[in-house]
Amino acid sequence: MSRKCPLTGKRPRRGYSYTLRGIAKKKKGIGLKVTGKTKRRFFPNMLTKRLWSTEENRFLKLKISASALRHIDKLGLEKVLERAKSKNF
């Protein structure tokens, strides 16, 4: 299975991990300096869930993001599935 959420379209993003050195100015230091920059990936918070579909009268096993789960709690599974189909996720 891919790491893309079928309901929200969230997918892994690219970014950097910074290595810092020094003492923060908040702690009365001279400030933090960047000593290294490494490429990394930021992954969405994916969960495998079994959700009940009232239209199909059965459980659906979906690998969705945590934000999609909040949308389902708010709007209902059928409405979220309709939106995902219309947006072609």
UniProtKB/Swiss-Prot annotation:
GO cellular component, one term: ribosome
Top-level lineage group: Bacteria
GO term, biological process aspect, one: translation
Gene Ontology molecular functions: structural constituent of ribosome
Residue pairs linked by disulfide bridges in the UniProt entry: none
Keyword tags: Ribonucleoprotein, Ribosomal protein
InterPro entries noted in UniProt: Ribosomal_bL28 (IPR026569), Ribosomal_bL28/bL31-like_sf (IPR034704), Ribosomal_bL28_bact-type (IPR001383), Ribosomal_bL28_sf (IPR037147)
Keyword DNA repair among UniProt keywords: no
Keyword Glycoprotein: no
Family assignment from sequence similarity: Belongs to the bacterial ribosomal protein bL28 family.
Protein name as annotated: Large ribosomal subunit protein bL28
Organism: Chlamydia pneumoniae (Chlamydophila pneumoniae)
Lineage: Bacteria, Pseudomonadati, Chlamydiota, Chlamydiia, Chlamydiales
The gene coding this protein: rpmB
